[in-house]
Amino acid sequence: MKALWAVLLVTLLTGCLAEGEPEVTDQLEWQSNQPWEQALNRFWDYLRWVQTLSDQVQEELQSSQVTQELTALMEDTMTEVKAYKKELEEQLGPVAEETRARLGKEVQAAQARLGADMEDLRNRLGQYRNEVHTMLGQSTEEIRARLSTHLRKMRKRLMRDAEDLQKRLAVYKAGAREGAERGVSAIRERLGPLVEQGRQRTANLGAGAAQPLRDRAQAFGDRIRGRLEEVGNQARDRLEEVREHMEEVRSKMEEQTQQIRLQAEIFQARLKGWFEPIVEDMHRQWANLMEKIQASVATNPIITPVAQENQ
């Protein structure tokens, strides 16, 4: 009976908490243009799924699956925020050092708050897992009710700090754009007089020095043409010399080839003259040997063992 009253009390408390603190359904009000915003939206979607506390969520909460996923999403978000902040720092350009330091501190503080919120959320989920494990099969409705309330509060705080970080980064980006525009203006102011002087000098050259430049260019062109003709003649002469040399080399090679062929034929004839008598003599000796063997066999027949036994 006491257990039944405890369940009813927990149900009433859960209903009161739900009525006193409605479900957060607000969305982050910006377009996910930057990589850090896209990473934060992935974290936000996963948190929304965890907040449902469905059977699958509760099952994964009892293991380390949820905290591992949240840790990975947190690290991705913080990494993208740092990368975007570094990119904006490189674009600040000639902004005053005081302004740079102030903007950097504001962004860093907002970034730290968001990171602390994420860390607090992960720790709270780990605490829930430990509490569930210590219940040893008892009812966990009260623990889930407290977790649901805490998740709603954490989601509000995360939204507030995320929007604050987005605003700080927007101010930082505006400062970077302003610094870049100032840098371009300063460069334009410095280069403006130089460009004007160059334009005037070009106009003066066009008005008073055009003819000397044309004469000089004509003379230079004549020298170039003469030099090219000279180089062409030298190249033709050199090519003719190379062709004659190659023809001479070819003739010598043909002559040497003919001599080698004749020497080979002479050597072949000598070898033939050396070995033919020897081969003929060996043939004669072999024929004589065979005749002697045949004659010996004919005069002395071989007596087989069978014949001896018959005798």
UniProtKB/Swiss-Prot annotation:
The modification Methionine sulfoxide is found at M135. Residues 270-282 are annotated as: Specificity for association with VLDL. Heparin binds at M154, R155, K156, R157, G221, D222, R223, I224, R225, G226, R227, L228. Sequence repeats lie at residues 72-93, 94-115, 116-137, 138-159, 160-181, 182-203, 204-225, 226-247. The keyword Repeat applies. The keyword Glycoprotein applies. Disulfide bonds: none annotated. It is found in: Secreted; Secreted, Extracellular space; Secreted, Extracellular space, Extracellular matrix; Extracellular vesicle. Residues 258-311 are annotated as: Homooligomerization. One of its GO terms (molecular function) is phosphatidylcholine-sterol O-acyltransferase activator activity. The modification Phosphoserine is found at S139. One of its GO terms (cellular component) is Golgi apparatus. Keywords: Chylomicron, Endosome, Extracellular matrix, Glycoprotein, HDL, Heparin-binding, Lipid transport, Lipid-binding, Oxidation, Phosphoprotein, Repeat, Secreted, Signal, Transport, VLDL. Residues 150-160 are annotated as: LDL and other lipoprotein receptors binding. Residues 72-247 are annotated as: 8 X 22 AA approximate tandem repeats. It holds the Pfam family Apolipoprotein. APOE exists as multiple glycosylated and sialylated glycoforms within cells and in plasma. The extent of glycosylation and sialylation are tissue and context specific. Glycated in plasma VLDL. Disruption phenotype: APOE knockout mice display severe hypercholesterolemia associated with impaired clearance of dietary fats. Excess cholesterol is more particularly associated with the atherogenic very low and intermediate density lipoproteins in the plasma. These mice are therefore prone to atherosclerosis. Mice lacking both Cx3cr1 and Apoe show decreased atherogenesis. Belongs to the apolipoprotein A1/A4/E family. Homotetramer. May interact with ABCA1; functionally associated with ABCA1 in the biogenesis of HDLs. May interact with APP/A4 amyloid-beta peptide; the interaction is extremely stable in vitro but its physiological significance is unclear. May interact with MAPT. May interact with MAP2. In the cerebrospinal fluid, interacts with secreted SORL1. Interacts with PMEL; this allows the loading of PMEL luminal fragment on ILVs to induce fibril nucleation. This is Apolipoprotein E.
